[in-house]
């Protein structure tokens, strides 16, 4: 089955904690602090793999974590950085942030890669906190947590050629005949619910990827039927084969069908309607198809659209159709290559930023308890040794400098009131 959406949870590596250590070499009785910094947490990186065609792997594993950084060591030795986790995705994958729907990355090129979740910074060792009044600091800073987020992966199908047309016009039959793909085929609407891919090899040895894209009906641009799913898959094909039932077996006019589908493409995205098209006039082996075929040719030839009479059931006319499509693809690829050579090169860089300030915190009151929360508060709590006077002094200094004490006063705190910061509770005294 072709999977084109997946939701996964990402957790980048935590930074290693800074070390509390002291020089203990012989003949150095008061060597001072020597705690090294923690290593950086591993990033989570998405990288294009041209050999992949689906998001199937992400269906079975939903949680991904990068390696944590190592803690700092004695003798001012840094901890080792955590190893990055590289996740391979097919070309054409879009990464969205689940809550906002914001596009984080659009991975199309063969060498595209992007850091989606950044590892936390390593904490500072106690050697950073030595001063004229603090000769032997007994505290260090904990490493930062890595970024955590849930993302939705969406694969915009990358096929060279897409088969479009109303349900039951013979797209699935055509795909099964010209490729080794085995789509479900039956005589009812929306038999094809997900795209089927196949590789076409012409009699001249050329090849291209062909996709039988789920059928659509009027109102598809508004989401009717399989509309939005269908239209999303069309976007990145280079060329469309518009399959029409010229026998009119369901009582429809093939020319009207052609106009209706192109109208849906235009309403969804004007660029879709501008894609090069070739018409495969299917079911010409059925009596009565000839009149519709001549009418179709007369109208579309004036618009410069090639019409190929075929029968997917008997393989009539398929060689001519596929040879033309292969030739047209080469022309389009040459045009794209020329544009790429002349266009200014632009380096794609994505950096996932925190939505809130690094030192953001909140003060709330529940009954007689003042609760202070924030990422920097949590990190400060984790890195404070409350049994050490120097560490406690540094803790109080940070709260004062970052405005926490002022905010508590604004909230109405009084002498002796209880303050809670995660796992720590203490009474407030000015």
From Swiss-Prot:
Gene3D superfamilies: GTP-binding protein OBG, C-terminal domain (3.30.300.350), GTP1/OBG domain (2.70.210.12), P-loop containing nucleotide triphosphate hydrolases (3.40.50.300). Signal peptide: none annotated. The gene is obg. An essential GTPase which binds GTP, GDP and possibly (p)ppGpp with moderate affinity, with high nucleotide exchange rates and a fairly low GTP hydrolysis rate. Plays a role in control of the cell cycle, stress response, ribosome biogenesis and in those bacteria that undergo differentiation, in morphogenesis control. GO terms for molecular function: GTP binding; GTPase activity; magnesium ion binding. HAMAP family: GTPase_Obg. This is GTPase Obg. Residues 159-330 form the OBG-type G domain. It comes from Alkaliphilus oremlandii (strain OhILAs) (Clostridium oremlandii (strain OhILAs)). Its cofactor is Mg(2+). Monomer. It holds the Pfam family MMR_HSR1. GTP binds at residues 165-172, 190-194, 212-215, 282-285, 311-313. Mg(2+) binds at residues 172, 192. GO terms for biological process: ribosome biogenesis. Keywords: Cytoplasm, GTP-binding, Hydrolase, Magnesium, Metal-binding, Nucleotide-binding. PROSITE patterns: G_OBG, GTP1_OBG, OBG, OCT. GO terms for cellular component: cytoplasm. NCBIfam families: Obg_CgtA (TIGR02729), Obg_CgtA_exten (TIGR03595), PRK12296.1 (NF008954), PRK12297.1 (NF008955), PRK12299.1 (NF008956), small_GTP (TIGR00231). Residues 1-158 form the Obg domain.
